[in-house]
């Protein structure tokens, strides 16, 4: 804009730097009284200086006037090879970018693999202005997949700097989402590293692969955790992403229309949504510390029921690590309850089933209840108490509360049945004690005479041992 504020010194975008500290650009305010040209009598060098100052201050009218003079070319290069368009893009001056492009500036110009589009995506300015600059450059056929010397593409710079709408526009214009730079970073990795949750959600929605590793073997979730972005770590590690690839089927025009008509206020309210799905499989794996296996099981369409009935050879066939197999098998052994087929037993056998097998059944049933209690406690501790800390937007809480109410009813029914079982056992025990024909077990019989004999034997043995010790002591003396 013609009256925009003073811009900073131009530097190469995307982490690049010039070979000389003197880049040819000057900082300062123009004297408005001497700003206009007085005819065509000024020397060429003075016009170049005025042109650079006009670019610095964003004086569009002066830039147009100097270009109209015909002495300065729209693709003129200054020190370290930057053109006026590259400089205008570096300060996110959309109006200057439009003027220069309309005058024939080359949108595909690059210097040392630094493109104008990369410069715009890494510019210091508002996202609104950066978005306008990027849109103008893309409309003039700037390639969104040309990388810099570090193999970083425009979408990586936009993701690194937190420009959600720019990322979406680049993808709509053909940018590759899963391209990796020289360190193996993708746009998703950069967003996770910098803590831009909205970018992470948008990239997942656009088909980003969260399983691509860096050169040192790190996943985006691990990069987020290392930089203490715990929300993003949880988002990438413990949740499914049903919206992944949602926009890939849209045409370029449909996607651009969707992006440009988005209400900025809605965007600030987290319009990029997904749903956390904690099913029985996820809870089971989380309880064993095997969260990393969730994606593997989902890819192979293995349900919890199938997992619990797998044999050892099936674990190996499906690519389970030996350590993970041992954890699952140990858990299955603890949960195993021997099924008792009462209908196949004779009347005499039914009377005898109330022994060790029945006790073992009750003990295992009690252990399973303990596991269920622990699972619920773990979920309670994992859920944030503040709704603002929820990483993903959830469905209506009414759905969750209705299921919880059903759980409470089932627990109450279970409690009632267990109480009935307890009363029945107590009744059987009372009848047994009052039955005159009942013969107590051998271990239950403890007569007065047997107790006296046991105590006498112990006393005699102890006294004899004491005499033996005394005798040995006197002999030594």
From Swiss-Prot:
> Which keywords describe this protein according to UniProt?
ANK repeat, Cytoplasm, Developmental protein, Differentiation, Meiosis, Phosphoprotein, Repeat, RNA-mediated gene silencing, Spermatogenesis
Identify the residues that the record assigns to the SAM domain, covering every copy. 274-336
For the modification Phosphoserine, the affected residues are 17-18, 20
Spans of repeat ANK: 46-76, 80-109, 112-146, 150-179, 183-212, 216-245
A GO cellular component term found in this entry reads: pi-body
* Primary residence: cytoplasm
Residue ranges spanning the membrane: these are none
Q: Which Pfam families match?
A: Ank (PF00023), Ank_2 (PF12796), SAM_2 (PF07647)
Localization, per the record, is: Cytoplasm
Q: Which Gene3D superfamilies match?
A: Ankyrin repeat-containing domain, Transcription Factor, Ets-1
> Among its keywords, does the record have Phosphoprotein?
yes
According to the UniProt record, where is the region Disordered?
Answer: 1-24
Assembly mode: Interacts with DDX4, PIWIL1, RANBP9 and TDRD1.
The job of this chain, per UniProt, is described as: Plays a central role during spermatogenesis by repressing transposable elements and preventing their mobilization, which is essential for the germline integrity. Acts via the piRNA metabolic process, which mediates the repression of transposable elements during meiosis by forming complexes composed of piRNAs and Piwi proteins and governs the methylation and subsequent repression of transposons. Its association with pi-bodies suggests a participation in the primary piRNAs metabolic process.
- Protein name from the UniProt record: Ankyrin repeat, SAM and basic leucine zipper domain-containing protein 1
- From which organism does this entry originate? Saimiri boliviensis boliviensis
Q: Its gene? A: ASZ1
């Amino acid at each position: 804009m013609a009256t925009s504020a003073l811009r900073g010194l131009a530097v190469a975008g995307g982490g690049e730097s010039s070979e000389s500290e003197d880049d040819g650009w000057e900082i300062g305010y123009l004297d408005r009284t001497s700003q206009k040209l007085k005819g065509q009598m000024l020397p060429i060098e003075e016009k170049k200086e005025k042109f650079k100052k006009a670019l610095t201050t964003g004086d569009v009218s002066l830039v147009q006037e100097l270009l109209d003079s015909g002495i300065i070319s729209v693709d003129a290069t200054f020190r370290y090879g930057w053109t006026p368009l590259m400089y205008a893009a570096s300060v996110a001056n959309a109006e200057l970018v439009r003027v220069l492009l309309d005058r024939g500036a080359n949108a595909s110009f690059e210097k040392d693999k630094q493109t104008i589009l990369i410069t715009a995506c890494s510019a210091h300015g508002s996202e609104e202005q950066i978005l306008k600059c990027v849109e103008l450059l893309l409309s003039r056929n700037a390639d969104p997949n040309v990388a810099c010397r570090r193999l970083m593409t425009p979408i990586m710079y936009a993701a690194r700097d937190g420009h959600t709408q720019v990322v979406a526009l680049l993808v709509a214009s053909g940018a590759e989402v899963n391209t990796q730079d020289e360190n193996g970073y993708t746009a998703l990795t950069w967003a996770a590293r910098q803590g831009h949750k909205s970018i992470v959600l948008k990239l997942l929605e656009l088909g980003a692969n969260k399983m691509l590793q860096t050169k040192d073997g790190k996943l985006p979730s691990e990069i987020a955790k290392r930089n203490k972005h715990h929300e993003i770590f949880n988002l990438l590690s413990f949740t499914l992403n049903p919206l992944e690839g949602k926009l890939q089927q849209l045409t370029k025009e449909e996607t651009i229309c969707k992006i440009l008509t988005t209400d900025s206020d809605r965007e600030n309210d987290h319009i990029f949504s997904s749903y956390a799905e904690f099913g029985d499989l996820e809870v089971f794996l989380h309880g064993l510390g095997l969260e990393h296996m969730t994606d593997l099981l989902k890819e192979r369409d293995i349900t919890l029921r199938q997992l619990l009935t797998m044999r050892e050879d099936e674990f190996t066939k499906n690519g389970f690590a030996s350590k993970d197999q041992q954890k699952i098998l140990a858990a299955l052994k603890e949960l195993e309850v021997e099924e008792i087929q009462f209908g196949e037993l004779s009347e005499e056998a039914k009377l005898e089933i109330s022994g060790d097998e029945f006790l073992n059944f009750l003990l295992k049933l009690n252990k399973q209840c303990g596991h269920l209690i622990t699972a619920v406690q773990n979920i309670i501790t994992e859920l944030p108490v503040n709704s603002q800390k929820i990483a993903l937007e959830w469905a209506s809480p009414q759905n969750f509360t209705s299921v919880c109410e059903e759980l409470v009813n089932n627990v109450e029914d279970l409690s009632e049945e267990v109480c009935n079982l307890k009363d029945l056992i107590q009744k059987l025990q009372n009848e047994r004690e009052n039955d005159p024909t009942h013969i107590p077990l051998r271990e239950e019989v403890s007569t007065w005479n047997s107790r006296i004999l046991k105590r006498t034997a112990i006393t005699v043995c102890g006294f004899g041992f004491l005499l033996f010790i005394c005798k040995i002591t006197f002999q030594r003396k």
